[in-house]
């Protein structure tokens, strides 16, 4: 692989990489506002300027400047190197680049920063970006100067509603055009553009349009400053109080990697941020997915219920014991859920097929929906493939409706509340449902046990491409809910069976042993001792 | 009628001489804060004295490791809370050593003057309280009167009488007030007058002298072996003072003497402290003479020093600077440092480790009292019970500093 030198450090690069991308691949950040690894490079912010050394024997690129000489008391002609944007110049074999080590580069960053903040409003205390703002970071890293301009800053429109999700503040904008390029290049809907020039420059929505569609949140996500904010997160939380968990989006079978930001003090999830994964979602997420963090709180089942009346877990388990007394295993059906994690499904599968000895395995989940060829998948369940791997024989819920109608099944133990078909006919069976969210199956249940959502426990999900991904626990369990695999062990105990698991890692080990499903959450194997 | 004990030998009349166990503290007025001494007494003689600290425990160092570097200042105020300014300056010097910062000359003189005021307050409290515990209430009131004068100056400068939180990384919270020099020049002679008045009353008092002289004596070698520093060490005749031995700030540019004792007993410790008050007066006078009336008090280091408040409200640059320093804390370069200064009771050391973030990775404090209190049982064993009060009082153990 060819290499070049950045500040004396030899870095490999792939042919065609720009300097900034080659450095980024090695985990070195050259400061930038307008460059984004997932977008084209306009080279308009000038923050990534670097000093490229001339090849041996070549004349250096230089600028003639007048510089104030305090000793002489006058401006004297000098030369300084012509800096070039690292986001636009391709790395070349043997190239020598100076960034942090060049006095001229540091000076350029300082001056670019001063220009960008020239008309910036004093908004940090009320700005949602505060705490994760590039303007703040780079001022500390490269600025550290005080304001020299004494004029009134230029005022521009604030609080401009761009569409149903995004609000724009032109005064905070640094005109990097990341949002413009995202809409044009990734969302393929060039609805944003710029108008005017210089200090009147601002971002606008195409006349007659709104900023809408399925990827509007990403314009806020790529915004390096607080110019674009989402109506959803605006003024809701201060980012330095939030903690983050590495989650997997539950909105569809794509399984986008995300950061789930939550406030541990109020035990509430506040937002998703895409987590970079070249193989799954690159840098992006869709609007539906970005808003799906709300499902950690909305439509949740938080207490056990018997025939729709809230009760204690003990009484609910007693009721299960009563309604299951003397039932033949052959007439019991278990319903796995494509919404729930591998661990939850495995617990129910093992309980149903091994302990109860039932052969009737079905699968439920959410209905198919909108899809596109960017990220959004038709299948709206996070773990359909995972259920397939556990129980390839699982029959669709439609067949359970038929089987209940024909009295081949009288008792049902179901995971998850959602159903892809109208399940009203299941009312004829005695149903126990363990679910995190309200749905048709939770309403039909004789006994309903609350489960934790993906945000409250660690779980493995297999996306449509067959990739196993672990979603970490963020908030503490809400209400009296507990992970479904724990409730299933309790149901088993109530019916006189002993589950083989008491801990999550036991389920994971068992899935590996029985089904050969690799244990994603297992730490790397220790190096054997000599 | 014959006496009952007619047949008995005289020796058999004595009561069985089993040692008596007695708890002194942790809640005892002479136990300065909360220390417990478990005594084994034979009559009134202490056979064994087991000194136990730990009744005042706040998890001090761990608390310091949870906020930003600047948020440590209020905590170190509560080390030796009779001279918080010395702790503030000591911590500031430690962090500055880690950053490679040197504060402007004006600030160095200011820190010296304030620190020596705090030392006067510390010594007045120790000697005054010791006299009071031996029944001499009047000198205590005079000494505290003098201490009030010190605290009036500190209040004028910092806004607080006791816990000032006045130190800053790279400077002080505020420049000296216009009255500072005048206040010092007016108060210092009065303080020394009061000290002399108290001295005349105590040092001609037979009872006072008898209770101090030759009580709780320790040799210089033993004191060094125990890790003693400060006035307690100097009372044994070892002239080790960090201000002389390893000068910091501008201590190498001022004239002052290091008072030492000869016997290392309680009286020597009492006298060394009184001597140091006079030396502190000399240092303060020289410091305020040489401190400029204007000029910067803080380093020119935007990465650690807060911007001016009016600028924070009106310009984005200062807002960002303020935000970064308050919300994330000043980023101190990764590394470790041991920095030590002469505190009220001896070597006050800070061992700091930075991982380059805005929060200290490790704050280890070497409080002088910890080592000194460690030698208490050695001083007490074999002495009479009543010797505890002057001996313990003369060590000036401060609970907040002994928090380990």
Features from the language model and the residues they span:
Chain A
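A short, compositionally biased
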Residues: 1-2, 43-48, 253-256, 523
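N-terminal export/assembly segments and adjacent metallocofactor-ligating motifs
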Residues: 2-12, 16, 24, 52-57, ...
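A basic, amphipathic helix-loop patch mediating RNA/tRNA/ribosome contacts
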Residues: 19-53
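Intrinsically disordered, low-complexity Ser/Thr- and acidic-rich flexible linkers and loops
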Residues: 58-77
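Non-catalytic alpha/beta scaffold blocks inside enzyme catalytic domains
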Residues: 326, 351, 355-361, 365-520
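Acidic, Ser/Thr-rich low-complexity intrinsically disordered segments
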Residues: 520-530
């Amino acid at each position: 692989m060819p290499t070049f030198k950045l500040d004396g450090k030899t870095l490999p690069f792939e042919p065609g990489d720009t300097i900034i991308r080659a450095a980024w691949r090695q985990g070195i950040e050259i400061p930038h506002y307008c460059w984004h690894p997932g977008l084209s490079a306009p080279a308009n912010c000038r923050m990534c300027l670097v000093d490229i050394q001339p090849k041996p024997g070549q004349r250096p690129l230089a600028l003639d400047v007048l510089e104030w000489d305090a000793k002489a008391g006058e401006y004297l002609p000098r030369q300084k190197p012509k800096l070039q944007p690292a986001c636009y110049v391709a790395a070349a074999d043997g190239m020598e680049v100076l960034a942090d080590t060049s006095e001229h580069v540091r000076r350029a960053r300082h001056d670019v920063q001063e220009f960008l903040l020239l008309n910036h409003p004093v908004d940090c205390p009320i700005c949602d970006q505060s705490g994760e703002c590039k303007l703040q970071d780079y001022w500390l890293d490269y600025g550290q100067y005080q304001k020299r301009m004494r004029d009134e800053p230029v005022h521009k429109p604030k609080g401009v509603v761009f569409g149903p999700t995004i609000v724009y503040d032109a005064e905070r904008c640094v005109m990097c055009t990341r949002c413009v390029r995202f809409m044009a290049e990734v969302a393929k809907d060039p609805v944003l553009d710029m108008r005017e020039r210089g200090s009147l420059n601002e971002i606008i929505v195409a006349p007659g349009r709104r900023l809408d569609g399925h990827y509007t949140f990403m314009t806020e996500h790529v915004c390096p400053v607080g110019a674009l904010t989402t109506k959803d997160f605006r003024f809701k939380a201060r980012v330095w109080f939030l903690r983050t968990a590495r989650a997997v989006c539950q909105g569809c079978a794509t399984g986008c990697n995300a950061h789930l930001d939550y406030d541990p003090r109020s035990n509430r999830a506040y937002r998703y941020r895409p987590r970079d994964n070249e193989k799954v979602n690159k840098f992006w997420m869709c609007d539906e997915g970005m808003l799906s963090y709300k499902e950690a709180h909305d439509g949740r089942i938080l207490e056990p219920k018997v025939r729709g009346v809230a009760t204690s877990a003990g009484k609910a388990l007693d009721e299960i014991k009563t309604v299951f007394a003397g039932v033949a295993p052959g007439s019991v059906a278990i319903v796995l859920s494509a919404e729930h994690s591998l661990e939850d499904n495995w617990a129910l599968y093992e309980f149903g097929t091994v302990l109860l000895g039932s052969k009737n395995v079905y699968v439920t989940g959410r209905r198919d929906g909108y899809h596109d060829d960017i990220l959004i998948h038709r299948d709206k369940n996070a773990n359909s493939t995972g259920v397939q791997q556990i129980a390839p024989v699982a029959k669709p819920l439609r067949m359970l409706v038929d089987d209940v109608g024909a009295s081949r099944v009288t008792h049902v133990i179901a995971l998850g509340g959602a159903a892809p078909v109208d399940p009203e006919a299941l009312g004829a069976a005695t149903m126990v449902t363990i679910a995190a969210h309200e749905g048709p199956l939770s309403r039909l249940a004789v006994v309903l046990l609350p489960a934790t959502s993906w945000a409250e426990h660690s779980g493995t999900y297999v996306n449509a491409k067959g990739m196993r991904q672990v979603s970490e626990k963020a908030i503490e369990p809400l209400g009296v809910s507990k992970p479904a695999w724990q409730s299933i062990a309790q149901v088993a105990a109530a019916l006189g069976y002993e589950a083989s698991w008491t801990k999550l890692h036991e389920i994971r080990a068992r899935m590996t042993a029985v089904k050969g499903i690799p244990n994603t959450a297992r730490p790397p194997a220790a190096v054997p001792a000599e | 009628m014959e006496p009952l004990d007619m047949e008995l030998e005289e020796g058999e009349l004595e009561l069985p001489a089993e040692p008596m166990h007695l708890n002194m503290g942790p809640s005892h007025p002479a136990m300065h804060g909360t220390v417990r001494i478990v005594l084994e007494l034979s009559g009134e003689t202490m056979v064994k004295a087991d000194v136990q600290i730990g009744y005042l425990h706040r998890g001090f160092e761990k608390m310091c490791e949870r906020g930003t570097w600047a948020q440590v200042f209020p905590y170190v105020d509560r080390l030796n809370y009779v001279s918080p300014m010395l702790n503030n300056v000591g911590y500031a010097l430690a962090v500055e050593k880690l950053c490679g910062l040197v504060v402007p000359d004006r600030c160095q003189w200011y820190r010296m003057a304030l620190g020596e005021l705090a030392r006067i307050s510390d010594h007045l409290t120790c000697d005054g309280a010791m006299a009071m515990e031996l029944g001499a209430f009047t000198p205590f009131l005079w000494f505290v009167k003098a201490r009030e004068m010190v605290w009036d100056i500190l209040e004028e400068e910092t806004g607080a009488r006791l816990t000032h939180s006045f130190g800053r990384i790279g400077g002080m919270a505020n420049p000296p007030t216009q009255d500072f020099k005048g206040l010092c020049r007016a108060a210092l002679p009065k303080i020394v007058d009061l000290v002399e008045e108290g001295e005349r009353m105590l040092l001609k008092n037979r009872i006072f002298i008898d209770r101090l002289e030759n009580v709780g004596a320790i040799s210089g070698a033993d004191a060094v072996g125990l890790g003693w520093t400060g006035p307690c060490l100097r009372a044994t005749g070892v002239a080790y003072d960090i201000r002389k031995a390893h000068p910091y700030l501008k201590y190498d540019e001022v004239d002052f003497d290091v008072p030492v004792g000869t016997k290392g007993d309680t009286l020597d410790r009492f006298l060394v402290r009184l001597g140091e008050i006079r030396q502190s007066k000399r240092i303060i006078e020289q410091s305020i003479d040489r401190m400029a009336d204007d000029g910067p008090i803080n380093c020119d280091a935007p990465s650690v020093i807060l911007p001016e408040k009016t600028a924070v409200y009106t310009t984005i640059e200062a807002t960002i600077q303020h935000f970064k320093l308050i919300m994330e804390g000043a980023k101190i370069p990764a590394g470790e440092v041991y920095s030590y200064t002469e505190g009220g009771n001896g070597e006050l050391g800070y061992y700091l480790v930075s991982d380059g973030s805005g929060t200290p990775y490790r704050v280890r404090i070497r409080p002088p009292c910890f080592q000194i209190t460690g030698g208490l049982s050695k001083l007490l064993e074999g002495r009479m019970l009543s010797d505890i009060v002057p001996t313990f009082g003369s060590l000036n153990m401060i609970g907040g500093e002994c928090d380990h």
